[in-house]
Amino acid sequence: MAVVNKIGKIRKRNHALVAFDQDRIVRVILRASTSVGGFEQDYLPGINDRIFAAGETDEGIAQFLSDLVVVCLNADERHHVSNFPPTVEEIQNVVLHVLSSNGFTKVADTYTCFRWGHHWVREGAIPEAQFVRNGYPPEQMEPWVAWNREHDCDTVEGLNDIVRGGRLARLVSDSLERYEASLDEAARKVVARIEKGDQLKMIWVSGPSSSGKTTTTVKLTQRLEKAGLRFLMLNLDDYFWSLIEHPTDWIDDRNFETPEALDIQLMNEHLRALLEGKAIEKPVYSFKEGRRSALKPVCREKDQILLLDCLHGFYPPITAGIDPKVIFRVYIEAMNPLYEPNPMMPLYHGDRSDRRLTRFEDVRLLRRMLRDVNHRNHPPLATLLHWHYVRAGELFSIIPLKGMADCVLNGGMPFDLPALKPFFIGDDGIWPTVGDLKAYPSFLDAQIRHRRVTHLLDSVQGLTLAQTRDLSLIPGDAVVREFIGGSTISIPHNE
């Protein structure tokens, strides 16, 4: 695509003016694409197939997208004046807009993770060694991919064969054995830190929404209590700002997914006070009233460890001023690697594989939707339309910071999708219809996600509802029970 570039300079973060280099935009887009297996991961007929046809190769597509970035930058006439060039952040925002608005959501998410990871390195929140690039380092993912391959559940077809062949019980047992072993290892690491002489006073269990933090926190606590440790647990949801202080968007939704939805300053003050042996007056939040309704005195006994289950537990301002040596961080995310067939891509001549990885966040969306319907009285469509806030929050201050973790756990299981599917299909299924989305034609994120998850649900062999209630098949302490019901573990947010 022939584009006349009208941008002469850009303003760097140190306010220096340097020449605008479109090739740099091509390189960063291509790098984000390459790190997730190429643009083919985002091929969507009817949305971006013409870009694939125009670009033909990954390099050509990156060039085409960079041209669109230039078109957007040219549209702001201020940038034509040498004293008012676009800033680095403005250019990054435009790159993200171009990727997202043309359906390249996986590349956009990867670009966002790179962007904020670099931000946290620049801020000194993490060293370069903790920069996790696209959020899923190969050395972390390869063992899980290998495990699924060994158990013939790394592909949709293989998983379906297991379900149809009546062999799911063995897969459930093996998967939970692996998960429990990872919890044993996490507990050993905590004890080892203490035996080494570290004065641990705080344990965080953090990770993206609906990853299984609550079940994991309970199970880890049980192990550590057997080792003689004592805990003080705080409900950090009590630190939400009052509802009136959360602005609404054009569909009357609120962004509760950003760390700044919490009173970070007060939380930090209280955590520091508790670690110093001081008593605090902790707020008690009434979700029914949408405000803080009371204060509760809390103090930490000298031998108690603060145990905190929070989405944003790694967000640096929360623990500002607290010695890292007293903190142990556990990161959990549902990351079950499952591959599906790649669709045909006419006119695209880039390297392409036969399969592509399903999205981890799509399984978490199903988990959250089911929880929201059953325990929060939220309609399924509202959860789908809200999910862009969830992704923005976790790509800013959760996934890019996972390198801070002392231990990384996988809350995703190969049997999750078969267990979740029966709640979303049929006459009583809660999955929104295409018609439900017609009133929101501008919500491309929701439209794309709906199409992708619908295809995934159609392709996976599900259990029956009766099978999902069978505790001999899926035990009551399995993570997925947080969402499908039948959990034998007390789940505060489900009460």
List PLM regions with ranges.
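Hydrophobic positions on the alpha1 helix immediately C-terminal to the Walker A/P-loop
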Residues: T215-L220
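Long, C-terminal-biased catalytic regions of enzyme "large/alpha" subunits
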Residues: M1-G135
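Conserved glycine(s) of the Walker
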Residues: G212
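Charged, amphipathic alpha-helical linker segments immediately N-terminal to NTP-binding catalytic cores
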Residues: G135-E185
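Glycine-rich phosphate-binding loop used to anchor ATP phosphates in small-molecule kinases
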Residues: E195-G197, N268-P324, P379, T383-L401
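Hydrophobic anchor at the beta1->P-loop junction of P-loop NTPases
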Residues: I203-V205
